[in-house]
């Protein structure tokens, strides 16, 4: 059974005593980590909570009886050549460097670019984690935090929001605003309190996603709902943490979605509830790079789009205003980017 690993794993197998390993697992679960590397003999630790336990059986990483990767201790050139030989031979390769100062991380990342093997680097400090994610701009596929004790995990709290790079949005000029009749709109209630100006990337075309902001603002008629993004019509695309898109109609409680904060950083948020209701809709068209794009939102003053002057209510939006958008080329097939010619109107 092949599994998709997240950008951050926790390692507990390297510690000598059972109590030390148990403390790491407990602390990792309290911090919200979901994938932990264990020793095969630590079966009892699976019952500390609901998480994905990956067993380190020698060099082999096992899940549900299947090898999903290799854990390689890197001490010199010989092990580096072994690492290179595993390209496209295993789904995941975890590198545990003996000395970060002499590890040619750039060589690893360049060798494994566009490979079928994901490369993870074991790190002990947040500085090492950032280096691993930023080397040669693209960075490694993920990191494995290798703590000496539970207290070490606290230092990585900021790294979790750094899993995703800052997204610099472009501006599009609003060219048309028109009311529509009733339609099915999707309201996403998250398990997080979202900031003013924070929102999700949503649009009618996958090549242009608008920043639809959270309902973190007070209104004359309704209290703020800082956990909510009134996302728009059911047909719309929304950007997910793995870089794919989904239709809003597919979103359900328990999903993870991507949220863009006002400083440009991205974070994942959990969906607690989705409401699809019939509401009056609003069609907004904008032009960027010589092309025209659109988004369909509920016609209500609590719905706001991100703009250079802040989050602006769709009730106050005017022709000629600038709104923030995320542009990309190509198309999407089942949510994945495709280098193809496509025309979405």
Curated annotation (Swiss-Prot):
UniProtKB keywords: Amino-acid biosynthesis, Aromatic amino acid biosynthesis, NAD, Oxidoreductase
Catalysis performed (reactions): 2-amino-2,3,7-trideoxy-D-lyxo-hept-6-ulosonate + NAD(+) + H2O = 3-dehydroquinate + NH4(+) + NADH + H(+)
This protein's record includes keyword rRNA-binding: no
Gene Ontology MF terms: 3-dehydroquinate synthase activity; dehydroquinate synthase activity; NAD binding
Name of the top EC class for this enzyme: oxidoreductase
Repeat listed as a keyword: no
GO biological process, one term: amino acid biosynthetic process
EC number(s) reported in the record: 1.4.1.24
HAMAP family in the cross-refs: Arch_DHQ_synthase
Family listed: Belongs to the archaeal-type DHQ synthase family.
Task performed by this protein: Catalyzes the oxidative deamination and cyclization of 2-amino-3,7-dideoxy-D-threo-hept-6-ulosonic acid (ADH) to yield 3-dehydroquinate (DHQ), which is fed into the canonical shikimic pathway of aromatic amino acid biosynthesis.
Protein name: 3-dehydroquinate synthase
Organism: Methanocorpusculum labreanum (strain ATCC 43576 / DSM 4855 / Z)
Gene behind this protein: aroB'
